[in-house]
Amino acid sequence: MAHNKFLPRVLAAAAAMMLLAGCSSKADPGFSPANPVNITIWTYYNGEQLEAFNALVDEFNSTVGKEQGITVESSSHGSVTDLENNVLASAEGKVGAEAMPNIFSAYADTAYALDEMGQIADLSDYLSEEDRTAFIEDYLSEGNFS
């Protein structure tokens, strides 16, 4: 039963990927297979969570992503602490750090620190009221820095 506590996180990440697909209907960003876009996602998922998430990424890439020219590349950065350290090193431009990913898993304290550095995008314009109902209200409130 331990893996059940991770299900909401995997579902939230899946919802985020589906929102990427939905964005084109609200404000046409011009996605096209002729002009492909690559989205990088960093997680701390391992084991079953990583397998489930990678299956969602593969499904997205072979369906909506393929149709719209969006490729998602996901990578696990080990533990939550490892991921936090890697994201912060990237945001701070430390020597040897990888380029900042487009999307990453983060707890509120890390997200807040990155927001203070100007590294967090406001997704409010991309979530309709209907979209918001798919999430647990506390998750949305915790991630609202305004």
Model-derived features: positions:
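Secondary-structure boundary motif
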Residues: S25, S62-K66, A89-G96, E116, ...
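Short loop/turn motifs at secondary-structure junctions
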Residues: A14, A99-M100, Q119
